[in-house]
Amino acid sequence: MKKLFVLLAAMVMTLSASAFDFDGINLNASVNKISAEIAKRGYVYDETTDAFTGMCQGTQIYMSMNWKDVKEAGKLGQLIVDVPMKEQNALSIVTKMFNVIYHTADGGKANVYSVSNDGTILEVQSSSKGIRLVYSTPFYKK
């Protein structure tokens, strides 16, 4: 449980009118710059999971990027973060925390949060490994 709260504390990002950061990585930057920042922070590409893997505040995470479904070439559409968790009620724990931190978005849809003034949206999902955090930037084309 302590691991969960340390991770969530790390994910309480800075709200800014110009950019949204995940672990200090500006998601509104170009894909090339985001990739360089990911490498600089020690995340490495893992072929078996088809994702970057590394430690975020002492917790192993897996990150993948969607740069294909975008409104502007060279920008990031989505950052997908998988957080392995064994707790049966992991999704419930995480959403209760985010309900306190962030405003719900998308007409009050459950598990969808507005996390920045720039239009970045976070959707919290359950996955086979734990939880999945999907950050959709303003450049994401649905």
Regions found by a protein language model. Give the residues of each.
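Sec-dependent signal peptide recognition
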Residues: 2-8
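N-terminal signal peptide c-region/cleavage motif recognized by signal peptidases
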Residues: 14-16
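Long, charged/polar, surface-exposed segments that mediate recognition or autoinhibition
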Residues: 20, 61-113
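Short, hydrophobic/aromatic-rich segments at coil-to-beta transitions
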Residues: 48-53, 108-114
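Short, exposed beta-strand-loop hairpins at the edges of beta-sheets
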Residues: 114-136
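Short, solvent-exposed mixed-charge patches
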Residues: 140-142
